[in-house]
């Protein structure tokens, strides 16, 4: 049980760090983190479309982030590395954040989702799914799913091959959740299938 509690605690801490960095580094095209324990402390890799923004002028921002990770989140001797995201359109976290930003600017959720899917597919994705949930058009909360192409949904391919990202948009009607899943062009499936090109699909779904 002690080991289970440790992993739960570490998982919660990583989630809180991810949420904090998403807010602080939105302008950097924040795409997630990877935290690993090392003999010298804690290695933190920050994925971003604009690494220069994360580093800051003269390294000022990255030094401040290091202090916050150590003092506020309790990481032992954090060593931050910044890795550039070569194609932000294939990073689900980046796309979820950008979609949330579009909603906060007042772009209609359907228009924002269709534009995102078209851009993602143009950049070579094999498939993409976007779920937008909350009070989208009125008082009743609902969830709308948009998708195109092929996306592994279960098993090992869904866990290892699909890029997944989540973000929130703060609107007058309340919080809107945005979940993006992307199957990248280089995903190798155990049983290769032929995907018939279809237009973007849309459906209202019940919350699970």
Swiss-Prot record:
Pfam annotation, one family: Ribosomal_S3_C
GO terms, biological process: translation
Domain KH type-2: start-end pairs: 17-86
Molecular-function GO term, any one: structural constituent of ribosome
GO CC terms in record: cytosolic small ribosomal subunit
Tagged with keyword RNA-binding: yes
UniProt KW keywords: Ribonucleoprotein, Ribosomal protein, RNA-binding, rRNA-binding
Gene3D superfamilies per record: 3.30.300.20, Ribosomal protein S3, C-terminal domain (3.30.1140.32)
Stretches that traverse the bilayer: none
Summary of subunit composition and partner proteins: Part of the 30S ribosomal subunit.
HAMAP family: Ribosomal_uS3_A
Record-stated family: Belongs to the universal ribosomal protein uS3 family.
Role: Binds the lower part of the 30S subunit head.
Name by which UniProt lists this protein: Small ribosomal subunit protein uS3
């Amino acid at each position: 049980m002690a080991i289970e509690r440790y992993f739960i605690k570490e998982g919660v801490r990583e989630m809180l760090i991810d949420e904090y960095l998403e807010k602080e580094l939105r302008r950097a095209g924040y795409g997630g983190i990877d935290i690993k324990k090392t003999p010298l402390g804690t290695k933190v890799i920050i994925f971003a479309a604009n690494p220069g923004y994360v580093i800051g002028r003269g390294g000022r921002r990255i030094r401040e982030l290091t202090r916050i990770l150590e003092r506020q989140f309790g990481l032992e001797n954090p060593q931050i590395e910044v890795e550039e995201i070569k194609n932000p359109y294939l990073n689900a976290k980046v796309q979820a954040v950008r979609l949330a930003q579009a909603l906060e600017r007042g772009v209609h959720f359907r228009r924002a989702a269709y534009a995102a899917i078209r851009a993602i597919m143009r950049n070579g994705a094999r498939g993409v799914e976007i779920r937008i949930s909350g009070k989208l058009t009125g008082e009743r909360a609902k969830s709308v799913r948009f998708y195109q192409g092929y996306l592994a949904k279960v098993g090992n391919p869904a866990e290892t091959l699909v890029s997944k990202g989540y973000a929130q948009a703060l609107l007058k009607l309340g919080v809107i959740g945005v979940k993006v899943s992307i199957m990248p062009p280089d995903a190798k499936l155990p049983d290769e299938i032929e995907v018939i090109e279809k237009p973007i699909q849309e459906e209202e779904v019940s919350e699970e």
